[in-house]
Amino acid sequence: RSSRGLGDVYKRQIETHVIKKLPANWKVSAEAFLEAYHVLETHSEGVYTAGDANADYDIFGDHISRFVHTIGYTSPHIEENRPSQQEIYDILMGRRTDEGAGKKLPDGLTAREAYAEHVQNDMKEKYKQDFSSLTVTETIDSIEYFVFPNAFFFPGLQLSMVYRFRPNGVDGALFDLLFLRPKPIDGPCPPPPDAFELEIEDSYTKCPGTEFLGAVYDQDTNNLLSQTKGFKTSLKKGQSLGNYQEARTRHLHQTLDKYLEEKNG
């Protein structure tokens, strides 16, 4: 492990801060990020490099849950014509750099391993720190902790974010999206940037610093209005949740119900 510790979020600086209005309440908005199974439909282009259906989910007491969503594995949903390691590497590198696609996968390395090495070198150049002691999963995977009631923390190197969902009326929410990067080892930490505010109809790609993830966040939240309308018009009074893939969504509501029951006696 790195001596800096990936869990040391206080050793990060805020590089980008987005506040996006969403057309769904804070619970529905948070649910969009509690599971990885939606990749197949919501991020269909990602199925060749994302282990969605085989993501790992863990629950720690009433207030904390986690998923580990691997990058560089092809989805189990793809049963035929699965890409080679070279093809996976091309996709990963093409997303990160304009000139990356087409580079030969180094001998003896998987696409994940080679891509993680590239990310470590890229971040070393940008932030003048050595990240070579980090594991592949610490470097590139989507490792997400949810802290009840409304906060998410990603302690990885490539994917280092914080989410917060706040009520904004009955059927609206404010989504704080913060991209974190390593603090300088020497010298003062730069001041946090002003928040970039987006309306419901605005794309995340309007905000500088979101890079290729801006379009991904558009996909994550573009269906929230339809969900809200569906909740209000459905004859069914509750959600039908998967036993495992949506365990964290159930966990959120079970914990919330405990607090409401205590308050109401």
PLM feature spans:
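Glycine-enriched catalytic-core subsegment of oxygenase/oxidase enzymes
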Residues: 30, 34, 40-265
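Short amphipathic
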Residues: 13-23
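Single conserved hydrophobic/aromatic residue that forms the stacking wall/gate
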Residues: 1-6, 10
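Acidic/His-leaning functional-site neighborhoods
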Residues: 11, 38
